[in-house]
UniProtKB/Swiss-Prot annotation:
Species whose genome carries this gene: Yersinia pestis
Protein name in the entry: 2-C-methyl-D-erythritol 4-phosphate cytidylyltransferase
PROSITE patterns: ISPD
Biochemical pathway: Isoprenoid biosynthesis; isopentenyl diphosphate biosynthesis via DXP pathway; isopentenyl diphosphate from 1-deoxy-D-xylulose 5-phosphate: step 2/6
Family: Belongs to the IspD/TarI cytidylyltransferase family. IspD subfamily.
A molecular function (GO) term: 2-C-methyl-D-erythritol 4-phosphate cytidylyltransferase activity
Keyword Cytoplasm among record annotations: no
Function description: Catalyzes the formation of 4-diphosphocytidyl-2-C-methyl-D-erythritol from CTP and 2-C-methyl-D-erythritol 4-phosphate (MEP).
Pfam families: IspD (PF01128)
GO terms of biological process kind: isopentenyl diphosphate biosynthetic process, methylerythritol 4-phosphate pathway
SUPFAM superfamilies: Nucleotide-diphospho-sugar transferases
Annotated site residue numbers, Positions MEP for the nucleophilic attack: R160, K216
Documented EC number(s): 2.7.7.60
Superkingdom, taxonomy of origin: Bacteria
Amino acid sequence: MSNFAVSLPEVIAVLPAAGIGSRMLVDCPKQYLTVGGKTIIEHAIFSLLHHPRIQRVIVVIHPQDTQFSRLSVAQDPRISTVYGGDQRANSVMAGLQLAGQAEWVLVHDAARPCLHLDDLSRLLSITECSQVGGILAAPVRDTMKRAEPGIQAIAHTVDRQDLWHALTPQLFPLELLKLCLSRALREGVAVTDEASALEHCGYHPILVTGRSDNIKVTRPEDLALAEFYLTQRQSLNNDSL
């Protein structure tokens, strides 16, 4: 039997949480709404910190945010905070500046409270076989329609065979993500997720199949769905004890 262990690359997580979540129609940013006994952002952070390969989580907050520092998780020594910008890409870049010499960086939405540990493990395993990185994603199951420009009328059906829903976390080499985000921002490219910045630079990140219950809370009805998933998971955990 081997007497040495393989050393896996260090991974730092960045959690952009500087948005206001206007579609939720509530007074506070959506990441501070409570679901399953904790705020959404706490669920997101704990899902990362429970994995042994995540060394640190950098939370990117709005400059006027007064709520994060009140959470108990904010006192965890593995948590750092930095102020974000007016776009997601600017906020992620701010987080990357605190990542130090980490080889890999993992970016996760603060509004995704239902990440499974096994999905995270599968994504992290690509550091052993990829130099570009990858994302959690779910194959599209529904029939997809493209609308006529500017109106809610069907133009045609889109072939779903090669379509995937992009999820988070998304995992990339730190320096590569910095390079691609910087170029995308400089060239005015709309960056809706980190993978799109790499795509703009000609890279093809891996699609790692993730669970479809890893939802992003963006609308009021998503809260009840997240509550259901988290309660169901807790019930399964209790049954296994």
